[in-house]
């Protein structure tokens, strides 16, 4: 396949144009007065959302060079979402501003490598200052963080209650309700950090996850590599017409191929994951899962083998959600007495062990067994509203978790403005010289942009607001919802510092790559290439 090439300034300008198109699409959603974006779907109703990463994932541009820029900006949003779960629009706006200001300097003759170094040093100084300015979350601030992310006080209160009940490390899942009410239900469940063995198991392509309702659960201590050994069990599961969830040390070779083929053909809705943990801890964790789901672990030690067992060794659960990294089991069929006995056994082990590492791992297992799962059932009048609400609640859960981890700073873009003081005080920044020193100004101008757009979307002059906030004390800032300048933390306008730092670092990373790019190579469109070599 022939390629198209772009060089030097033309290459960088194409990347900038692509980043601009994506950033201009998402930045209208920034802040409490941000607008929505409507996404067309090939089938079903359109999606209405103000979630940056959801919008970014839908953007594909005609121009292949510009599309590279859009994909880079998409990477900023996706990475920020992976690390912090929110802040995707802020990250995209920062990336756009850093690229724009940086390219201006490069076009004027500055050395891209020096500009890159200056941006990296400046951003690290600002990120460190953000952490210094952060404070731990207290009381009602949990509800405030969630309410700001979800743009709903009602959802904020619901999430504060959920985290209050399951703890900051507890699992919160989001399901669709059959009513119009949104409610919190506490249920027994568990999450562990193993995802599906193959993306072919995915049932929801948009969210890249596999969801099994009312599923049978097979827990096998060893590897499954031969189809013959578990074919009888597979046939029995097929006759039951229920989905099958398999946990094993590994599923490989023809066994995995058979499961994938059955899944693709729609013969059997099946998902396989590797067992969590290692060695003796893996055996213990499998027993925990078995207790929770009413299953028996298939193991030679217990005199059980796959080719000789029936449906009686399988457990069940109301709902199992599997992503590429995690598995969440909700409402397992294990009896309350069995779970209580297992919890008592773990507590007894905890009192007997002297090893800090063992204690930590036992406490993790105890939390998973005893802590339960908070299920938020999202209700809405229409399917379009339901999807949009689910996006907002997912962002809010991630934001709240991030706030509980690293603390909070003043929201509304003000924290970035206050952290700019680090550029005048940090010795690593003040020691920069030449083109690297000019990059400090690039970061200084870029960090104003999130606040500028929050104010602009609310109908105010962004630059005037930013100038006024720069003169105020730390934690003072502009409340776009009320239009007042006030103590934002006291007013409940707060952001998780983890989200702000992740947005800043990811934006700087992509901007540095764009500024040091010299050549772009893309596929030549098929219609242009069709008659290549046949011209007479």
UniProtKB/Swiss-Prot annotation:
Residues noted as binding ATP in the record, renumbered to the chain: 29-32, 86-90, 412, 495
UniProt keyword Nucleotide-binding, yes or no: yes
Enzyme class, broadest EC rank: isomerase
Spans through the membrane: none
Any single biological process term in GO: protein refolding
EC number: 5.6.1.7
Record keywords: ATP-binding, Chaperone, Cytoplasm, Isomerase, Nucleotide-binding
Catalysed conversion reaction: ATP + H2O + a folded polypeptide = ADP + phosphate + an unfolded polypeptide
Alphabetized GO MF terms: ATP binding; ATP-dependent protein folding chaperone; isomerase activity; unfolded protein binding
Entry superkingdom: Bacteria
One CC-aspect GO term: cytoplasm
Compartments, as annotated in UniProt: Cytoplasm
UniProt subunit comment: Forms a cylinder of 14 subunits composed of two heptameric rings stacked back-to-back. Interacts with the co-chaperonin GroES.
PANTHER family membership: 60 KDA HEAT SHOCK PROTEIN, MITOCHONDRIAL (PTHR45633)
Similarity comment: Belongs to the chaperonin (HSP60) family.
Function: Together with its co-chaperonin GroES, plays an essential role in assisting protein folding. The GroEL-GroES system forms a nano-cage that allows encapsulation of the non-native substrate proteins and provides a physical environment optimized to promote and accelerate protein folding.
Protein name per its UniProtKB record: Chaperonin GroEL 2
Species in which this protein is naturally found: Arthrobacter sp. (strain FB24)
Gene: groEL2
